[in-house]
UniProtKB/Swiss-Prot annotation:
CDD domains: Ribosomal_L7_L12 (cd00387). GO terms for cellular component: cytosolic large ribosomal subunit. This is Large ribosomal subunit protein bL12. Forms part of the ribosomal stalk which helps the ribosome interact with GTP-bound translation factors. Is thus essential for accurate translation. Homodimer. Part of the ribosomal stalk of the 50S ribosomal subunit. Forms a multimeric L10(L12)X complex, where L10 forms an elongated spine to which 2 to 4 L12 dimers bind in a sequential fashion. Binds GTP-bound translation factors. Keywords: Ribonucleoprotein, Ribosomal protein. GO terms for biological process: translation. The keyword Ribonucleoprotein applies.
Amino acid sequence: MGKLDKKQLIESLKEMTIVEIDEIIKAVEEAFGVTATPIVAAGAAGATQEAASEVSVKVTGYADNAKLAVLKLYREITGVGLMEAKTAVEKLPCVVKQDIKPEEAEELKKRFVEVGATVEVK
C-alpha cells in the first residue's frame, strides 16, 4: 500500500462510519501510546495558565502604627504624589500594581507585609 497524503486520508475518512473511525482512533492510540483528548480541555488549561501569568496586588489593610510606612512604600512603587497616595491608602482596598508577573507580585507583597500591611494577590 502506498503512502496516503492528508487529502486522500480525509476522503477515506469521509466514506467511513463513526464506528469505523472510532476503531481507527483506538488503533492509533494503541500504536503510538497516546490518548486522544478533547481540544476544549487543552484550551481551558491554556486559559488558566494565561490568567495566572498576570496578577494584581492590593493593600487590604495595615496595622495602626504602619500607615506612614505603607504610604511611603505605596508612593515609592506607584510614583504618585503624596495626596494621591494618602487618599489611596486611606480608602482600602487599593490596587498597588496590576497586570504584573506573579514573581513581581510576591516581591511587592513581601515588601508591604514587612512594613505592616495586609496584601492580596489575585
